[in-house]
């Protein structure tokens, strides 16, 4: 039997996902896949990092990051800081889940439980810039700026369209290189 830590971002994109998470935890317990579950909730940025930064090898058999790419990024940074090398599973519930999507990770209850039961891990490359680790992509400029400008309430109402709306708002502020030269 395995021990799991679920790091859950309640402010993540699909905000009505707690029943889904409860169902997955129930499935894992009832099928004898895990016998201990701890849940760490995030309240603000970097909470997921803090929740995983002091973990020790063997403390958990795996961690489940429940959220979007930002939650996954914070968990990865915490696990690396801890040196625990605990395997990470991702349950996509955020607006942006490009890493989980690229790996075609399941998000439905039965498929997710089967993935955990099979416990086949995949090694991924980890990058580092300015002391920050990443497993997905590194970005800068307007794309990064938009993800920070879009507030949680707008994202909850509009979903991914919130990023588009923020992009429209910044158009008057962004001039092309051609315009700057002339």
Predicted regions and their residues:
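Short amphipathic alpha-helical segments
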Residues: 18-20, 76-79, 101-103
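Short, glycine/acidic-enriched loop or turn micro-motifs at the edges of active sites
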Residues: 12, 72, 95
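Glycine-rich beta-strand-to-loop/alpha-helix junction loops that act as flexible
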Residues: 10, 66-68, 91-93
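Short Gly/Thr/Asp-enriched flexible loops that form oxyanion-binding sites at enzyme active sites
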Residues: 71-83
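Catalytic core of DAGKc-family lipid kinases
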Residues: 31, 42, 81-182
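Hydrophobic packing residues within well-ordered alpha-helices of enzyme cores
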Residues: 24, 48, 75, 99-100, ...
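Glycine-rich N-terminal segment of FAD-binding domains in flavoprotein oxidoreductases
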Residues: 62-70, 74, 88
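ATP/NTP phosphate-donor binding region
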Residues: 1-63
